[in-house]
Amino acid sequence: LALPKERVLDFEVTHRLVDGGAEVDYTVTTNGSHDVTVEVLDGTTKVAEASGKTGTLKITNAKLWNVHAAYLYNFVIRITDGHAVIDEYFDKIGIRTFEVKDGHFLLNGKPVYLRGFGKHEDSDIRGRGLDLATVKRDYELMKWIGANCFRTSHYPYAEELYQMADEEGFLIIDEVPAVGFMQSTMNFLAANQGNGKKVGYFEKETTPKLLENHKAALTDMITRDKNHASVIAWSILNEPQCTSEGTEAYFKPLFDLAHELDPQKRPRTYAIV
């Protein structure tokens, strides 16, 4: 893989709806100091542009991204030296807002009811191997049954699934690979037999290293998926032990980190039964 010596490393966007239009705040990260330009295109028609590594793109009569009515704009970043293009990066963005307010999920300021599944990335054809035809079939089946949302149980999926969710207008609760954080009954009894002392899952000597690895996995997921319009929330854990004395001390740094890393400040959650 050949890369320019000076190149685009990352970018992030946030959206605001303003008087029938939209404002897109952006930040571009590069490994150099040359000029950066950003364009938003509706198909091949330029609808907004700005210069600099940070800025705001103003789009009049913006076409919003919505459930089963997805609309994606082309997003182009260029690093230039005079008239010479040093690097060029293309992506697609959907303009939408998502928040929790007064007990409601609001998509573009309007209530939306989440209907769907805790999904798994597998099939009878490829197992967990990526098969785009199978992925497309799954989206069509979910639409047929009336779903609009799924949780990536229990790990981030292949990026192509998020790209297709952006295109199909599906909502994703993106889950970090943190599952099984619970003492089994037999292990709990064996670990505490005869001493009368209860040791919860998050009071073990391995917990600091576990938390370090958990933070790294969470960082990787949010860094990769933060610009997908389909991603509306971060799931921090799946069915963890919640009665351990160390539960809050373990959970809180993760929830705080997710809020810090995400420019769009999506809701944070975890799955529990």
Question: What residue spans do the PLM features occupy?
Answer:
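Active-site cleft segment of glycoside hydrolase catalytic domains centered on the general acid/base Glu
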Residues: 201-211, 237-259
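Aromatic- and acidic-residue-enriched carbohydrate-binding clefts of CAZyme catalytic domains
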Residues: 115-120, 128, 175-222, 226, ...
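Alpha-helical structural elements of signaling/regulatory helical domains
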Residues: 226-227, 246
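Solvent-exposed loop/turn segments at secondary-structure junctions
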Residues: 156-158, 178-180, 238-242
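Catalytic-site neighborhoods of secreted/periplasmic enzymes
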Residues: 181-184, 268-273
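Secreted/periplasmic carbohydrate-active enzymes, especially glycoside hydrolases
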Residues: 1-172, 217, 232-233, 249-253, ...
